[in-house]
Amino acid sequence: MSSILNILPALAFLLILLSISAYIQRTSKENRQKDFAKDYFIGGRTLGGFVLAMTTAATYSSVSTFVGGPGVAWVIGYGWLYMAIVQVVVIFLVLGVFGKKIALIAREIDAVTVIDVLRARYHSDFLANMAAVVIVAFFCATMVAQFVGAAKLFEAVTGFSYLTGLTMFGLIVVIYTTIGGFKGVAVTDACCAIAMIVGLCILMGGMMHAGGGFNKIMSYISTQHPDMLEPLSRGKMPISLYISQWLLVGICTLSLPQSVVRGISYKDTKALHNAMIIGTVVIGAMTLVATWIGVISKGILTGPITAYGNSVDNIMPIAIVQSLTPFWAGVIIIGPIAATISTVSSLLLSSSSSIVKDVYMNIKGKREEQLSNNQIRLYSLGATIILGL
């Protein structure tokens, strides 16, 4: 019975996302009949500020936000939190640095994907095709990692098998991405971002209660693990690691295709400016709260790492199970699942657009063979399904 209670909230959430995507498909029929590629891959450039902010934040966050990051924070302490703080400005920089410029260029050349911009800028089909191949190859690998991480967390928290979780949210994310397209992904991403924030708040409350309150938790950490309160964590967080991580997760993420394409999709300048502000607050809340939860979980899971499977990836699943009732644990699991599927859906759509729009349609265009809107629809849906499966 407890296992059923664990799975019900997540299943209900996934069905809600599927319903939203089906609704988006019905409301987008007219636009897709006019220009399927533009509506399916960038939502017809109609995203408002709130949805743009939430979809960018949800896409940037992943299962590591809930599992890997907090797990490392359990070992290192506040030093990992200080490292993670650079992620607060990511959305502001992505939309602020690339957003407006990429939007102006995309509208001028009628670009639908980032690779369209590369092809127009460098006049090189070879470069564009290579970029498409790289995107598909690495995005597929990333999607596998996301699914595996979420499925293992699902198994640890709910008691259901790894394959059950993988099949359940794997199939649903493929279906809703396929039928909803970019607009469906954007709206469901917004729901996922909200679910992540709610889940983190519940988990934080559960952790505080299980640990006897903030003062008791911090008293234990300061007494038993004082190194966790130091920025360098007594050598565990050297300056070189700070610099490399700040560059990697703060600067180098600016050009991620799945994030940059959001700059092609927004409605107007007002939407962009609103998204920069909202997105910064949201990603800051998700990243910092999740990492901080990892730190305070040290006051709940007080044993050595060998007691928890000798892996930091086991820390958060065990902490969730020990801190919350089965029902609330099932609610919390929505957060990591939402982080996973919001990332996977964006990667899936980007990979599909790379194959259909950037490679196949370009080859046909060079041969002066025009594809009908219906053909583009079938190829796009087919590519999304095949890549997802």
Where are these regions (language model features)?
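Membrane-interfacial loop-to-helix junctions in multi-pass transporters
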Residues: 45-50, 122-129, 158-168, 233-239, ...
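Membrane-interface "cap" regions at the ends of multi-pass membrane proteins
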Residues: 1-67, 180, 205
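Loop-to-transmembrane helix boundary motifs in multi-pass membrane proteins
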Residues: 121-129, 136, 356-389
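Membrane-interface helix-loop-helix modules in multi-pass membrane proteins
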Residues: 39-110, 241-253, 259-261, 265-305, ...
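Hydrophobic alpha-helical segments and their helix-loop junctions in multi-pass secondary transporters
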Residues: 18-32, 96-99, 139-147, 151, ...
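Membrane-water interface regions at transmembrane-helix termini and the short interhelical loops
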Residues: 1, 72-78, 98-104, 149-157, ...
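Helix-loop-helix module between adjacent transmembrane segments
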Residues: 82-177, 245-250, 338-345
